[in-house]
Swiss-Prot record:
UniProt cross-references to Gene3D superfamilies, sorted A to Z: Ribulose bisphosphate carboxylase, small subunit
The protein, known as: Ribulose bisphosphate carboxylase small subunit, chloroplastic 2
Organism: Triticum aestivum (Wheat)
Pfam families named in the record: RuBisCO_small
Family recorded in the similarity comment: Belongs to the RuBisCO small chain family.
Transit peptide as recorded in UniProt: 1-46
Additional remark text: The basic functional RuBisCO is composed of a large chain homodimer in a 'head-to-tail' conformation. In form I RuBisCO this homodimer is arranged in a barrel-like tetramer with the small subunits forming a tetrameric 'cap' on each end of the 'barrel'.
Source domain of life: Eukaryota
Length: 175
């Protein structure tokens, strides 16, 4: 048998005519001889602060806030659970990225912390996570503890924040 030949209907596309004219677009009013409009934030500039570049180490997502209270931690962990992320706990005595033996990044430069037990798959209650944080604090009182929200569908870490700082660390984040 001979193969059937189908007639395809070709659609014509209009040829490219170049960019459209901007003559129909509104022109913003320009004042002054420089052609730039003056933008002012008014009195709001006086209340803005710049984060110091020396002496204060930054941690995770919520590091610019004061230490989280138990209620605030519960709310953050509850958000993590409602977002269908798996809570994980990690701890480290250093808590910062550092390069001690080599100038290139590697496994032992502080980016990877030790995981506490296993990820809490199936966890539905934020108090379960905080109970585990308390266990880490008892076992390693001089270690930083962070909570991680892991999305097991996309295989990515979605959120990470410090849940506990050791007593030797000042509350502002100074080491």
């Amino acid at each position: 048998m001979a193969p059937a030949v189908m007639a395809s209907s070709a659609t014509t596309v209009a040829p490219f005519q170049g960019l459209k004219s901007t003559a129909g677009l509104p022109i913003s009013c320009r004042s002054g001889s420089t052609g730039l409009s003056s933008v002012s934030n008014g009195g709001r500039i006086r209340c803005m602060q710049v984060w110091p570049i020396e002496g204060i180490k930054k941690f995770e997502t919520l590091s610019y806030l004061p230490p989280l209270s138990t209620e605030a931690l519960l709310k953050q962990v509850d958000y993590l659970i409602r977002s269908k992320w798996v809570p994980c706990l990690e701890f480290s005595k250093v808590g910062f990225v550092f390069r001690e033996h080599n100038s290139s990044p590697g496994y032992y430069d502080g980016r990877y912390w030790t995981m506490w037990k296993l990820p809490m798959f199936g966890c539905t209650d934020a108090t379960q996570v905080l109970n585990e944080v308390e266990e880490v604090k008892k076992e390693y009182p001089d270690a930083y503890v962070r909570v991680i929200g892991f999305d097991n569908m996309r295989q990515v870490q979605c959120v990470s924040f410090i849940a506990f700082r050791p007593p030797g660390c000042e509350e502002s984040g100074k080491a």
